């Protein structure tokens, strides 16, 4: 938001994106002045965002995956894709993450947040099974926001 990016957080039933996968449908009509649309999410929310993106490639410009992967084939979608995870993430299934890279466009930008963990992308506290972060959640989120601003050509 500091870089002029409209950020819309969509409230999900029980905080689970899987319970309302099409919640983003009504967002563009509420912000008609916006011309470039990206969808993204963290963990399961990222996986659901990827599934949504695969079905709405004509309406979106890109996808942001935070500690998430896409099971949907986006290789020829025309979408820009940014993926990030923390080096200390103990929740993300790295084998599945690596295996599902095949579903992303070849020019996908990937960032590993050094010292970051799974929960560091959010504001919900420690998560069972996660690694011990070396940086604060605030630092992880700032690094992510800065990297996204560069990726979106805003800096």
Where are these regions (language model features)?
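Conserved beta-strand scaffold positions in the cores of enzyme catalytic domains, especially
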Residues: 7-9, 81, 110-112
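Alpha/beta-hydrolase-fold catalytic nucleophile elbow
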Residues: 11, 64-67, 84, 114
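Short beta-strand/loop motif that positions the catalytic acidic residue
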Residues: 77, 83-85
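Serine-hydrolase catalytic machinery in alpha/beta-hydrolase-like enzymes
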Residues: 1-36, 128-129, 133
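Gly/Ala-rich beta-loop-alpha elbow adjacent to hydrolase catalytic centers
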Residues: 40-49
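Conserved hydrolase catalytic core segment
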Residues: 51-61, 70-71
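Active-site-adjacent alpha-helix of alpha/beta-hydrolase-fold enzymes
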Residues: 2, 85-139
